[in-house]
Amino acid sequence: MAALGSPSHTFRGLLRELRYLSAATGRPYRDTAAYRYLVKAFRAHRVTSEKLCRAQHELHFQAATYLCLLRSIRKHVALHQEFHGKGERSVEESAGLVGLKLPHQPGGKGWEP
């Protein structure tokens, strides 16, 4: 994982992932226990002065790790849906999956010189 960035950036990222999850379930994300926990935890560990707080850094690291997990799960599901085996594929579909196109014969199918 790269540098952590700001806690507010991590918090907004977590809320974005909660919105993606709630869109799948149909419930508003603000009604979930995860949303209430995140807001409560980030408010409790908010630093108002320039003091260093180990608990805030631990919370930020755990939140960034959880954000990485949620993003990875969402991307995995999208890739799985796109490339999951659907039985036997045609040659054109298989070529399209890897970004290739098959050559076309000038006279159409069955063309002979």
UniProtKB/Swiss-Prot annotation:
Keyword flag tRNA processing: no
Annotated GO CC locations: mitochondrion
Subcellular location field: Mitochondrion
Annotated stretches, region: Disordered: 94-113
Keywords, alphabetical: Mitochondrion
Domain of life per record: Eukaryota
BP GO annotations: apoptotic mitochondrial changes; dopaminergic neuron differentiation; mitochondrial proton-transporting ATP synthase complex assembly; motor behavior; negative regulation of lipid catabolic process; regulation of type B pancreatic cell proliferation; response to toxic substance
Subunit structure: Interacts with ATPAF2.
Family listed: Belongs to the FMC1 family.
Role this protein plays: Plays a role in the assembly/stability of the mitochondrial membrane ATP synthase (F(1)F(0) ATP synthase or Complex V).
Annotated protein name in UniProt: Protein FMC1 homolog
Species of the source: Homo sapiens
Lineage of the organism: Eukaryota, Metazoa, Chordata, Craniata, Vertebrata
